[in-house]
UniProtKB/Swiss-Prot annotation:
Protein name: Transcription factor RFX4
Assigned GO CC terms: chromatin; nucleus
Main location: nucleus
Localization (cell): Nucleus
InterPro entries for this protein: DNA-bd_RFX, RFX-like, WH-like_DNA-bd_sf, WH_DNA-bd_sf
Keywords: Activator, DNA-binding, Nucleus, Transcription, Transcription regulation
Bias type Polar residues, positions: 32-41
DNA-binding interval(s): 44-126, 61-136
Stretch list, region Necessary for dimerization: 315-487
Tissue expression per record: Isoform 1: Expressed in brain and gliomas (at protein level). Isoform 2: Testis-specific (at protein level). Isoform 3: Testis-specific (at protein level). Isoform 3: Expressed at a higher level in adult testes and ejaculated spermatozoa than in fetal testes. Isoform 4: Testis-specific.
GO biological process: cilium assembly; negative regulation of smoothened signaling pathway; positive regulation of transcription by RNA polymerase II; regulation of protein processing; regulation of transcription by RNA polymerase II; telencephalon development
Region annotation (Disordered) ranges: 27-59, 504-540
Function: Transcription factor that plays a role in early brain development. May activate transcription by interacting directly with the X-box. May activate transcription from CX3CL1 promoter through the X-box during brain development. May be required for neural tube ciliogenesis during embryogenesis.
Source species of the chain: Homo sapiens (Human)
Length: 735
């Protein structure tokens, strides 16, 4: 044991131990010199930092966040931009900043509901704080990061618009219901116009309008044409005589005004919201083709009904075109207005304009210019000057234009009913003259900001016209509402039910939609009626010996069943033996009245309306007491006819069955088909066959509105812009 303790150590291990000790001593000596130098340097830097800044204060940062930022849905701010604001705050307050990660934790203490999103194109995306905006009172205020502006994203965090956050899709409005339509109880109906039929028509028309609105929201504009054709050309025969009534025509006008206003609000909620080019193009195409679709769908219907439908649809199309052009101008003007350098130059050029001279020239154009007009021009001039001086966003200019039209047109016209058109014309004349003179003055003086003023002038003009056109549409709807309720003129309204008269055949291939005329007509004596005192409304029925066929340019003359000519004024059987009171007045109803005798039996089945809307009603309508010819419940056959019943593209005429046997054919040439060839499925608007294929298996085309399966959306049959993914539209418009 003692021998073990006195045992000599191994020489190799001893040498390695000595070498290791020497190395460690050298390292300690070197590190001591280095540490002394580092300590001196760190002390100097720490002293400098203590002299330059204060330690970080979280409460001060939270207070700064509360004063400069607020919660705002739909607004995004790049994280880098917000951190730069924070660094600027620390520099101005001599505060030690924390790193970006720690700053993010402080932000969430102030705004717990804040979320982050990665926005931008592939490879260029950046993280953004979503749901926070810069307050207008903040020194960091920028319209692109505020509630008033859209979210803007770029590499610097300021200048490029983020299309992911501003792209608009009408599908976001799915489930939108139309406002209430007129109630038959509130109408002043003539005694001869059955209330049950009017109520039925309003219910049918509301269903039709709701289907059109839902189709527009889904962006299936091609189906609008099919719905128009199916509704008007599939109208049940017993409803046809009331379509020419002025009361029903006014109801259609009021309902169309409601529908068009809803569609306009769905397609473009505001003119300031950026729209993708694909959506703009489709809207303009829809506005262009709507009139042609109505011409085809309303062919052979009463003239007064056609006129009101055409008038309102053309106003609606004009407003859609105005909205699209105005939206483009607003986006271009936004860049100009939000530039501080440009607005400063515009303000300088604006104040160099000779206001007195321009005001005098403007007053020369007015019929009765007064001193109040001069004061109004001066006031508007000063208000615009203030907007430029404050570098207001484009939303402030739009609000100013709204207020101007309200006090110069709406309030003035409200003092005198029916004066809106004249007041609007007078204001528009003054506005146009003043704006033109301002642009002229800037041109003569070579104003540096002339181009910017010209762009703003175009945008202002379009917006004022848009407001005035909207006022005219609303005024027209109010007129129709007053006429519908009997609040218009006190004169007795005489209604005419005149059969469409045939015209001579024309070789022109261009479709002719105006009613044909004939010199001969045959009066139809009505059957006996329990009504003792018939009203002028819905009072008579006359037919002509010449009937117009369901073609655009060719007409046929149909002799009576007995073979006697029309000149002998032989009585013709009334359509469906419907009771019509006697009267000396006539009324225009659609040709071809004897459609059931020749295979035209198509109409609607509105049985599912109760499942679609909460209005109490039955799925089938009982027999109407005023109509003795209808003995049982009404059930309308489905519209989709067989080729034998309704040969759309058949070269032979649909009237051929009635021209067989002893009646000679008057025209040996084939009849032009009723419906023109429609574009192929590769175009934006598909043919009605697509609708038939989709709904043809159902006996009721007005099924409850449900979301379609993903497989039902054929990408080639819808306009480019929607890509239907998992039942929802991820729009290509955002690209």
């Amino acid at each position: 044991m003692h021998c073990g303790l006195l045992e000599e150590p191994d020489m190799d291990s001893t040498e390695s131990w000595i070498e290791r000790c020497l190395n460690e001593s050298e390292n300690k000596r070197y590190s001591s010199h280095t540490s002394l130098g580092n300590v001196s340097n760190d002390e100097n830097e720490e002293k400098e930092n203590n002299r330059a800044s204060k330690p970080h204060s979280t409460p001060a940062t939270l207070q700064w966040l509360e004063e400069n930022y607020e919660i705002a849905e739909g607004v995004c701010i790049p994280r880098s931009a917000l951190y730069m604001h924070y660094l600027d705050f620390c520099e101005k307050n001599d505060t030690q900043p924390v790193n970006a990660a720690s700053f993010g934790k402080i932000i969430r203490q102030q705004f717990p509901q804040l979320t982050t999103r990665r926005l931008g194109t592939r490879g260029q995306s950046k993280y953004h704080y979503y749901g926070i905006a810069v307050k207008e009172s903040s020194q960091y205020y920028d319209v692109m990061y505020s509630k008033k502006g859209a979210a803007w994203v770029s590499e610097t965090g300021k200048k490029e618009v983020s299309k992911q956050t501003v792209a608009y899709s009408p599908r976001s409005k799915l489930g939108t219901l139309l406002p209430e339509f007129p109630n038959v109880k509130d109408l002043n109906l003539p005694a001869s116009l059955p209330e049950e039929k009017v109520s039925t028509f309003i219910m049918m028309y509301r269903t039709h309008c709701q289907r059109i609105l839902d189709t527009v929201i889904r962006a299936n504009f091609d189906e609008v044409q099919s719905f128009l054709l199916h509704f008007w050309q599939g109208m049940p025969p017993h409803m046809l005589p009331v379509l020419g009534s002025s009361t029903v025509v006014n109801i259609v006008g009021v309902c169309d005004s409601i529908l068009y206003k809803a569609i306009s609000g769905v397609l473009m909620p505001t003119v300031l919201q950026a729209l993708p080019d694909s959506l703009t193009q489709v809207i303009r195409k829809f506005a262009k083709q709507l009139d042609e679709w109505l011409k085809v769908a309303l062919h052979d219907l009463p003239e007064n009904l056609r006129n009101i439908k055409f008038e309102l649809s053309r106003r609606f199309s004009q407003i859609l075109r105005r909205q699209t052009s105005l939206n483009h101008l607003c986006q271009a003007s936004r860049t100009v207005i939000h530039s501080a350098d440009i607005t400063f130059q515009m303000l300088e050029d604006w104040r160099n304009v000779d206001l007195n001279s321009i005001t005098k020239q403007t007053l020369y154009t007015m019929e009765d210019s007064r001193d109040e007009h001069r004061k109004l021009i001066t006031q508007l001039y000063q208000e615009f000057d203030h907007l430029l001086e404050e570098q207001s966003p484009i939303e402030s200019y739009i609000e100013w234009l709204d207020t101007m039209v309200d006090r110069c047109v709406v309030k003035v016209a409200a003092k005198r009913q029916g004066s809106l058109k004249k007041v609007a014309q007078q204001f528009l004349l003054m506005w146009s003259c003043f704006g033109t003179r301002v642009i002229r003055d800037m041109t003569l003086h070579s104003a540096p900001s002339f181009g910017s003023f010209h762009l703003i002038h175009l945008m202002f003009d379009d917006y004022v016209l848009y407001l005035l056109e909207s006022l005219h549409c609303q005024e027209r709807a109010n007129e129709l509402m007053r006429a519908m309720k009997g609040e218009g003129s006190t004169a007795e309204v005489r209604e005419e039910i005149i059969l469409t008269e045939a015209a001579a055949p024309t070789p022109s291939p261009v479709p002719s939609f105006s009613p044909a005329k004939s010199a001969t007509s045959v009066e139809v004596p009505p059957p006996s009626s329990p009504v003792s005192n018939p009203s002028p409304e819905y009072t008579g029925l006359s037919t002509t010996g010449a009937m117009q066929s369901y073609t655009w340019s060719l007409t046929y003359t149909v002799t009576t069943a007995a073979g006697s000519p029309a000149e002998n004024s032989q009585q013709l059987p009334c359509m469906r033996n419907t009771h019509v009171p006697s009267s000396s007045v006539t009324h225009r109803i659609p040709v071809y009245p004897h459609r059931e005798e020749h295979g035209y039996t198509g109409s609607y089945n509105y049985g599912s309306y109760g499942n679609q809307h909460p209005h109490p009603m039955q799925s089938q309508y009982p027999a109407l007491p005023h109509d003795t010819a209808i003995s049982g419940p009404l059930h309308y056959a489905p519209y989709h006819r067989s080729s034998a019943q309704y040969p759309f593209n058949s070269p032979t005429s649909r009237m051929e069955p009635c021209l067989m046997s002893s009646t000679p054919r008057l025209h040996p040439t084939p009849v032009t088909p009723r419906w023109p060839e429609v574009p192929s499925a590769n175009t934006c608007y598909t043919s009605p066959s697509v609708h038939s294929a989709r709904y043809g298996n159902s006996s009721d085309m007005y099924t409850p509105l449900t979301t379609r399966r993903n497989s039902e959306y054929e990408h080639m049959q819808h306009f480019p812009g929607f890509a239907y993914i998992n039942g929802e539209a991820s729009t290509g418009w955002a690209k």
